[in-house]
């Protein structure tokens, strides 16, 4: 159990960058501190698999939301009283090793922040508290890919809006005022409609493969899309419309002074997206995961490497 005494001593919030759930978690924690009259700790957004994460310097009393200390160096944080709240399967050993709280299919980073930061600290009107609870729930529905949830459409809308507005906007909004949930959902619905229109063209142009793995036939779709912020939704649309068992989408980014290829994986459960991502040093959940590979790989090389790895992992 995370105590209020431990929370009020936090020196820095570290949250998952470029992720609606990570943005949501940071907003929730920041709002919780503001509600007590405290100056909220500064927030540092970091992405898994980047130099900033791998080379992170350990400090006393850091609060990790939807992310952990580096998986290969986490023991350096022992004795520094970190609070670690994460739900990524590949980081479970870090969370448990540092006596943090590991989530499940109903507790993403935002829900963990709500239950373990806002609930112990909160001092706000019930209506505002309930709005943050709803916000956390929608972040969780989207991040854990609960497509059958009646809240799926709103969860997608919220994710689009958070990515467009940006992580710094999110933290500042939590500092200066009430949660603008209705405005975010209204913006997100418009964005979602635009993304769905884009998705129809991607379905037509996606590369399709039928993989024979043991006694199974696995249907695979692969596509490239320049906008990393919308690739998850388009992958989900492709999976439903083709239909197929697993979708692999990739795009290129410039980070750590180099070009890298970011690969996003979506699965219907027939193939574990997490197992595939972890084999490349990434992570995620069984139906939604991701990883990074060298940015100088050609599209044909990416297709060959990924399809070969899927076959190897599922023989």
What is each residue range found by the language model?
Residues 149-208:
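Accessory alpha-helical/coil subdomains and C-terminal extensions
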């Amino acid at each position: 159990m995370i105590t209020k005494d431990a929370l009020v001593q936090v020196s820095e919030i570290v949250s998952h960058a470029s992720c609606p759930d990570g943005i949501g978690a940071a907003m929730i924690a920041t709002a919780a501190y503001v509600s007590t009259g405290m100056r909220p700790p500064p927030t540092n957004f970091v992405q898994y698999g980047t130099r900033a994460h791998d080379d992170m310097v350990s400090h006393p009393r850091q609060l990790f939301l939807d992310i952990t200390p580096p998986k290969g160096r986490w023991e350096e944080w022992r004795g520094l009283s970190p609070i670690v709240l994460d739900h990524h399967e590949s980081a479970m050993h870090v969370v448990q090793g540092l006596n943090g709280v590991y989530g499940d299919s109903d507790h993403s980073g935002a829900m963990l922040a709500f239950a373990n930061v806002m609930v112990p600290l909160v001092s706000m009107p019930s209506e505002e508290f309930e709005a943050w609870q709803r916000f956390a729930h929608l972040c969780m529905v989207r991040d854990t890919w609960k497509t059958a949830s009646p809240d799926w459409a709103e969860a997608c809308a919220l994710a689009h809006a958070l990515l467009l507005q940006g992580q710094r906007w999110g933290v500042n909004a939590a500092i200066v005022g009430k949660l603008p949930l209705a405005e975010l959902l209204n913006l997100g619905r418009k964005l979602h409609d635009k993304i769905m229109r884009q998705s129809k063209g991607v379905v037509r142009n996606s590369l399709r493969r039928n993989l024979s793995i043991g006694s199974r036939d696995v249907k695979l779709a692969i596509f490239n899309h320049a906008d990393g912020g919308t690739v998850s939704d388009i992958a989900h649309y492709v999976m439903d419309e083709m239909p197929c068992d697993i979708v692999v989408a990739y795009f290129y980014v410039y980070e750590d002074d180099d070009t890298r290829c970011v690969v996003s994986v979506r699965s219907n459960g027939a193939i574990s997206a997490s197992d595939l991502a972890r084999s490349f040093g990434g992570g995620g959940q069984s139906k939604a995961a991701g990883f990074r590979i060298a940015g100088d790989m050609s599209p044909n090389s990416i297709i060959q490497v990924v399809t070969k790895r899927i076959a190897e992992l599922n023989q």
